[in-house]
Amino acid sequence: MAQALPWLLLWMGAGVLPAHGTQHGIRLPLRSGLGGAPLGLRLPRETDEEPEEPGRRGSFVEMVDNLRGKSGQGYYVEMTVGSPPQTLNILVDTGSSNFAVGAAPHPFLHRYYQRQLSSTYRDLRKGVYVPYTQGKWEGELGTDLVSIPHGPNVTVRANIAAITESDKFFINGSNWEGILGLAYAEIARPDDSLEPFFDSLVKQTHVPNLFSLQLCGAGFPLNQSEVLASVGGSMIIGGIDHSLYTGSLWYTPIRREWYYEVIIVRVEINGQDLKMDCKEYNYDKSIVDSGTTNLRLPKKVFEAAVKSIKAASSTEKFPDGFWLGEQLVCWQAGTTPWNIFPVISLYLMGEVTNQSFRITILPQQYLRPVEDVATSQDDCYKFAISQSSTGTVMGAVIMEGFYVVFDRARKRIGFAVSACHVHDEFRTAAVEGPFVTLDMEDCGYNIPQTDESTLMTIAYVMAAICALFMLPLCLMVCQWRCLRCLRQQHDDFADDISLLK
């Protein structure tokens, strides 16, 4: 029996190891729906958790509660830059890839990075310009020593963009002086040769290639003190802290390593399917972005979702400006009718073939409290779902319900119910699965790619068409010039004859 025990344990371990496949993008025509069994069909799970891996799980006490911020203004972490170290608050942004800090006086900055005071700063003698839908910044690239006091006990030399000019980038009263882009090099500015901070961290240290975020949105404050108006959270660098979530972690593949792109396969409002072509949900991409406040949806999806939310909450009438994010709605303090607003479920592609899982979002997430206009008698909210022209963006209001694991090493993103999410006694945020879903890869939007040979063929065809149009014109011009020359010769001869007479 003792000799058979190791083989028995080995066999049992093999049964729970996850299987991984490679995702391939396939260009196919739009589908009218997803095939397969109904999404309501739940499949049994063999295990709730994957085997633990050394260094990936455990306690990260020094990193817990290392994020601060204000509702709608982003979450920031304290970082030090240079020698001697200069302390700055840096916005945590999974939707960009540059590490950039204010490096010149600005009305909204209480402090800024002073390169001339750092003995370890190296100028790369290269400029960088980053425009946004609204706002922009430009600066100069360099490198310096960087560390995170409430993070891993390491110091790395990282690329830094020193922001010298900006417009509508810094936010008055936000208390952050820079931005930490945690996405991939492909979207770094000025180009993908600029190594992002997290890549430098992993290469120069023994920190595992993953991080996780717990964003704890503000429940509506009882008064307007600075402390109660703040939000907090945790950024766990290099691992997963099991104390920050409840239940199981469910993973969805990262479709492409630029933004943190995922695939949404279905959307429900209060359990009712929007019944749209699943490609519409991902047109032209779906990303997880902590630097964006709202849940942003493509135009068609936004209109369908708002129509369904309006119908579900029809017991009260709201101005059109509320649904566009232009007007607030207020109720007497403590009387917000959460029950009239529906829950929203997003189904994400699972790691296992033909399986998906769903994350359920509460109205306490997509109705964002606006503290600076509320009084002690009123609770006021802004509708935090908005229209997008650049695809679906799962912003902070979505992430605030969940513990989100950015497992870069295994190219996947995990979701579990956050231990700090806001809820009521009737409903709670949820992560549930698995559900049967077929042909999920077809839901991803593929940007049309045109290779050089195709472009050359098009160029030759266009040149031939131009030549066909130009040839008759050239013949007509030549004929006209010949006739003109003959007429001039005739006229000259006639004049000579008249003179002789």
From Swiss-Prot:
Q: What is the effect of changing residue 93 to N?
A: Decreases beta-cleaved soluble APP production
Give compartment(s): Cell membrane; Golgi apparatus, trans-Golgi network; Endoplasmic reticulum; Endosome
Principal EC category: hydrolase
Which sites are catalytic?
A: 93, 289
**Chain positions covered by the region annotation Disordered:** 39-58
Can you state which reaction this protein catalyses?
A: Broad endopeptidase specificity. Cleaves Glu-Val-Asn-Leu-|-Asp-Ala-Glu-Phe in the Swedish variant of Alzheimer's amyloid precursor protein
**Lipid-attached positions, S-palmitoyl cysteine:** 474, 478, 482, 485
Which Cys-Cys disulfides exist here?
A: 216-420, 278-443, 330-380
Which region is the signal sequence? 1-21
Cross-link type Glycyl lysine isopeptide (Lys-Gly) (interchain with G-Cter in ubiquitin), residue numbers: 501
Q: Which family does it belong to?
A: Belongs to the peptidase A1 family.
What is the protein named?
Beta-secretase 1
The source organism is Homo sapiens (Human)
Query: What lineage, starting at the top, does this entry show?
Result: Eukaryota, Metazoa, Chordata, Craniata, Vertebrata
